[in-house]
Amino acid sequence: MESKREYDYILPGRAESYWLATVPEPSYPALKGDIRVDIAIIGGGIAGLTTAYLLKEAGFSSIAVIEAGRILKGVTGHTTAKVTSQHSLIYDRLLSKFGKRQAQQYAESNQAALEKIASIVASKKIDCDFVRKPSYVYAGSEDSTNKIQNEAQTARNLGLPASFEENLPLTFKTYGAVRFNNQAQFHPVKYLNALAEEIHEDGCHIFENTRALKIEGEEPVTITTDKGTIRARKVVQATHYPIHDRPGLFFQRLYQSRSYVLGVRIRDPFPDGMFINAEEPVRSLRSQSTDKGELILVSGEGHRTGEEEHEISRYQNLEKWVRSVYSVDSIDYRWSSQDAISIDHIPYIGRQTSGNDSIFLATGFKKWGMTTGTVAAMIITDMIRGKYNPWEEVYDPSRFKPVESAKTLLSQAVEATKGFVGDRILPTHKEASQIGPEECAILQNRGGE
């Protein structure tokens, strides 16, 4: 019998995601032997399953989704499941850093992803607790009010349903908020289990407990797994971290962040909406209807993975805070999630490398994967169909230029690798004379270094 961890004796609540605890677990077979398909998708979360669903809806009839463990047991099953184009305070930063065109692409794509989910729920009549609600980013201190006002103005100028609100119906003091109307929340596992049922029939397959080990070649691409080999015309990597990392060096261009969730019953009435503050530490709130009444999901306390020795304190901080602002009846659930974040905080979606139409990538969703994972599915589906997508530029995995990115990349590499480099960094040029203007390169000296 497995012994309990130290914090099981200290922290209240069931150590399991509410989403996974409240839905029967489906079962799909493992791969047996070698197969050939048109499209192979690695990863059984929202990005992988939505991509498979959209491709099948577009007429592709030979698709395989492979998952190393069980579908939806990773990040997707441990989300807070806000379906919104409001990703904290992002639009003012996007406008200043990337310009209006790319900020517009990000805004339009995530708003479209929200509506795509709503459309699928309606057309397939999926019972997944989908409900429209306003979403708020609030200022927890006066120092953040100007940022909130600027964000509201920028988001509104980009065509988003944004407004500035001076007062919120919360039990604690706030200093203004940016409100997005007509956003949504849902039960992600109910939603994606329904999509999985649509996928796994008529020549399309989901294979669980099938780990991808290696990806090689181009059309056909060969995926070596621990259960057999898959050959496919196109491959989509919708994993938390790319299996096929080189070229691209994504181990240097992504870092991991862990955050924590409590499922809380309170005696106070909870207002209509989803809420998150603009400061650190993050405090995020949303409600979920259950058979036992309303459950409030309280989340935050994010930190870089590996930098916290005592994770128990993160749960305790959330518990202390929620008890300070609400009358708590019970804490029924607790869980944590680990997210991948890119160095510029925009996901990598599209062709893994420019010019390669065989291998596609979706990663770095920065804790907003319900919409960005759906954006990934929409963009990659269009690319595989040979159809232009108006949002692909802002998410392009090859968007970094050496001179502009070198300082950030080097700094990120130190944090991400922690001494782990191995053979991933290979020489790119033989001689220094081969390096062009505004380029950087990796050289091998005569001593082999």
Enumerate the language-model features and the residues they cover:
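Glycine-rich active-site loop/strand segments that organize a redox cofactor
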Residues: G74, H78-S109
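Helical element adjacent to the flavin cofactor pocket in flavoenzyme catalytic cores
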Residues: N146, T154-R156, V178-K234
